[in-house]
Amino acid sequence: SNGYNFLGSDMYNPFDILLFISKKHKYQNYWFETGTPTFLIELIKKNNYFLPALTNLKVDEKLLSSFDINNLDFEVILYQSGYLTIDKVETSIFGSPEYLLKIPNKEVKRSLSDIIIVDLYKDKNVIPNKTAIYKSLLENDMDKFKGSLHSMFSSIPYNNYTKNDLAIFEGFYASIIYVYLQSLGFHIIGEDVTNKGRIDLTIVMDNAIYIIEFKLDGKEYALEQIKKKKYYEKYLNQNKDIYLVGINFDTNDKNINSFEWEKYQL
């Protein structure tokens, strides 16, 4: 479904609808015109939040608890500010409700990704060409994909690394790739659950599936983990080409230092 859900009632953003009417029924992304909460960016930085987790998010009753400004919960903030909505409600083994959350629609996905990207690069004009990454995945051109990602990290201002403690965490680099791909409108699954573990990032396209694992400073071999745990088995019945991609980041160079890939062969 598309839009918001509050315990059974579906709705769209009313202010978005008013803007749509006032602009003579012109279809466009109106999310930024409803406000850009910069405090979300600061909360992400402060808590080292792994953004791909937003696609498989489950919370308990704290979601509906009162808003405590002295104890900000990132998931609750996203829910109350409209960046997350209830997908469905389940009952835990203890009998209490559990809420599965989702990002409401593509407009919100792109808006959330864009505010993070703009903050990261500081200048929208230096953001690497999105077309290169988009085309590389559509054309299954892994060399171009690698080069585009490398260029993307190279374009991040140095101060954003030196003044950011998150740069020492694997989640920092994975989150950048996640928001960048999401801003392009791809179907992204973060922390994709399989019977053998969790895939860091899965990109599902019409003609192919990309299974991506991230590592930091060569501590482990990313591609080897994908093959060892047979993450690809989850998608064998989709009759699509499957690409296994292992990416390692170097915290000194602040970029990718190893990019290995294989096309899965039946």
Residue ranges of predicted features:
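A short helix-loop-helix "switch/interaction" segment in the helical subdomain of ASCE P-loop NTPases
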Residues: 1-12
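Short, internal active-site loops enriched in acidic
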Residues: 6, 249-254
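Extended alpha-helical interface modules used as scaffolds for assembling large macromolecular complexes
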Residues: 12-224, 228-230, 241, 254-266
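Short catalytic/binding micro-motifs of nucleotide second-messenger systems
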Residues: 231-235
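Extended hydrophobic secondary-structure segments that form protein cores and membrane-embedded regions
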Residues: 243-248
